[in-house]
Amino acid sequence: MGLVTPLQFYGMDINPFAVELAKVTLTIAKKVAIDKLNLTEQELPLDTLDNNIVCKDALFTPWVKAEAIIGNPPFLGGKHMRLNLGDEYVEQVFKQFPNVKDVDFCSYWFRLAQDNIDKTGRVGLVATNSISQGKSRKATLDYITDNKGHIHEAISTQPWSGEAKVHVSIVNWSYEQPQQYFLDDKEVSLINSSLQPHIDVSSAKTLQANCNKCFQGVIPVGKDFIVTEKQVKEWITKNNKNEQVLKLFSMGSNLAKNINGKPNRWIIDFNNLNLEDASDYKLPFEHIKNFVKPERDKNRDKKTREYWWKYGAKRPAMRKALAGLSSYFVVPRVSKWAIFVPAPFNWLPGDLNVVLALEDYYVLGILTSNIHRLWVQAQSSTLKGDTRYTNTTCFETFPFPQPSRKGEQPFAPTDNVIQQIRNKTIELHEYRTQQMEKKQWGITQLYNEYFHEPASKLYQLHQELDKLVMQAYGFQAEDDILSELLKLNFELAEKEKQGEKVIGAEAPKR
């Protein structure tokens, strides 16, 4: 007799065809096993699997306690659940899982698997790679590790072979602590809940010294706020007052692909103007009334419907922080390299931009260094192969060099080092600008070509900048940079808690 039979398998699906297909597959598998393994059990009668593989919703049906759980839960971002599943169903889910909201739909399966696995069993699930990030991570992989689970094998990210154009993570875990850990097919010493082999920086604290400096750009809510350059020229020619509400609109793609990141789109921006004042800009206002308002009238949000000429998210805090600056620094929210670049004050950043309301090239140098890159890679979220830079997890938690640290041995970057970082960053910026204009490339192509080439000027400038930033922190080559940064983050958070002043995104003063 075989040690495993179809009657030991259980499963659920809301698709009746998938349920029947699973039953047939198990029946065929039994026949194949008998033939290949020369088993003595009888092929007939067929096993009745109607009580094993059932057409039910796994989120609302008790699971059988199992020794092994495998599955491919549905991929659906938390923000899309209501649109795809309906309000009534989503409210039922929230009622069933009152402490788990705004997460990827597959997160609920991870929690149920953790709750229903045998103490000696194992689980293996596939999910979008956002499962190791933000709220989804807290609801799933943190839940597993906080409840005595051990992630023993995982693929952190790989393209999904199915229809969904996403990257996925594969996670295997158990209650029993493993002897070996394998991450991305390599043996590692451990796997944390961020699906990384090194120190987990997700516990880093928000530093108040970094707050109100870094922002996500505006969200118009209406594609027809965007207009052509031809329209802009015509409207300004007819009334130059219109120039006040017509702005170059910075998207993530222009920052990555265009020379110097220059936007190639224009947008109408009435900001906080009331209806009467907005209508004084006749041609732009008529355009919004004719093309944006009909779509806004269908919007579920009352405020969005009533204030149809205004953006869904105007970002007043960002605008206030940018007021008076001649330029600022900006990075695409999703990109391969996550490089901050200078932007003139008259670019209006969209929501695919993360904006730093500062002009000091010393700060840009710190954020351009490998030290910050390591932090971003450890903190950032991804959906495909690119890096998602967030103003909260990547920037507000990041500890900048301080006037004094390391206990009995006060350390501070000298004025000379601070100025050298500024100068080197300006040199790097000027070099990149010259190369982009010469080659007609965007910054992504420039970095793709030269960042990893030791003989390139780009590589050499980054190496020189990294050495200066290491000096600013007082780090040594043998230091575990992430560990040191996390330690510094905790130190600064504790100082802030005690009412002490710490240095955020600015040059320390001796």
Give, region by region, the residue ranges found by the protein language model.
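Exposed loop/turn and edge beta-strand positions of beta-sandwich/beta-sheet ligand-binding modules
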Residues: T5-Q8, H167, G350, C394
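S-adenosyl-L-methionine
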Residues: I14-A18, C55, A68-E163, L195-R510
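Membrane-helix interfacial "entry" motifs
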Residues: V4, Y181-D185, Y389, D415
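Short, polar/flexible loop-turn hinges at active-site or ligand-entry regions and domain interfaces
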Residues: A33-L37, K95-K101, Q179-D184
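Polar, glycine-rich mid-to-C-terminal structural blocks
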Residues: I170-C211
